[in-house]
Amino acid sequence: MSAVASVKDFVSSFMLTELLKGMALTGKYMFSRKITIQFPEEKTPLSPRFRGLHALRRYENGEERCIACKLCEAVCPALAITIESDVREDGSRRTSRYDIDLTKCIFCGFCEESCPVDSIVETHILEYHGEKRGDLYFTKEMLLAVGDRYENEIAANRAADAKYR
């Protein structure tokens, strides 16, 4: 390092130029419009592709959509989905057990993409919690209840996203 460079470094550090540059940047944004959102009171709009709490859907006649193909179970990278199926008298398969462990789930959306009948979907519900570990273990009945309750919202989001699928 030359003497001139070391003198420049000394003067720069002595005059606190980095500190002044930082203060100038802070001053520049101090009086601009605030963009912080106070979350529980204010909510931002969510994309139709947002991946939140899972739900199982039914057909309009009330029959559950899941045909127990187990594609979602096979494609799940976190191994969060467990499915058991039974064969009906007419030869069709339906699930007898469909469980999702949300403590394992990484919300990748592969289950939703792989489903051939749009049975498993991820809703816009992002405010859920559990007081115990078992509270985040969703059974088939719980997932169907979520799907029944939010079917109109799910259908609207699927329709808004249909041209991109």
Swiss-Prot record:
Its cofactor is [4Fe-4S] cluster. GO terms for cellular component: plasma membrane. Its main location: membrane. SUPFAM superfamilies: 4Fe-4S ferredoxins. [4Fe-4S] cluster 2 binds at C76, C105, C108, C111. Pfam families: Fer4_7 (PF12838). It catalyses: a quinone + NADH + 5 H(+)(in) = a quinol + NAD(+) + 4 H(+)(out). It is an enzyme of class 7 (translocase). [4Fe-4S] cluster 1 binds at C66, C69, C72, C115. Keywords: 4Fe-4S, Cell inner membrane, Cell membrane, Iron, Iron-sulfur, Membrane, Metal-binding, NAD, Quinone, Repeat, Translocase, Ubiquinone. Binds 2 [4Fe-4S] clusters per subunit. Residues 57-86, 96-125 form the 4Fe-4S ferredoxin-type domain. One of its GO terms (molecular function) is 4 iron, 4 sulfur cluster binding. It is found in: Cell inner membrane. One of its GO terms (biological process) is aerobic respiration. Disulfide bonds: none annotated. It is a peripheral membrane protein. Its EC number is 7.1.1.-. InterPro entries: 4Fe4S_Fe-S-bd (IPR017896), 4Fe4S_Fe_S_CS (IPR017900), NADH_quinone_OxRdtase_chainI (IPR010226). NDH-1 shuttles electrons from NADH, via FMN and iron-sulfur (Fe-S) centers, to quinones in the respiratory chain. The immediate electron acceptor for the enzyme in this species is believed to be ubiquinone. Couples the redox reaction to proton translocation (for every two electrons transferred, four hydrogen ions are translocated across the cytoplasmic membrane), and thus conserves the redox energy in a proton gradient. Belongs to the complex I 23 kDa subunit family. NDH-1 is composed of 14 different subunits. Subunits NuoA, H, J, K, L, M, N constitute the membrane sector of the complex. This is NADH-quinone oxidoreductase subunit I.
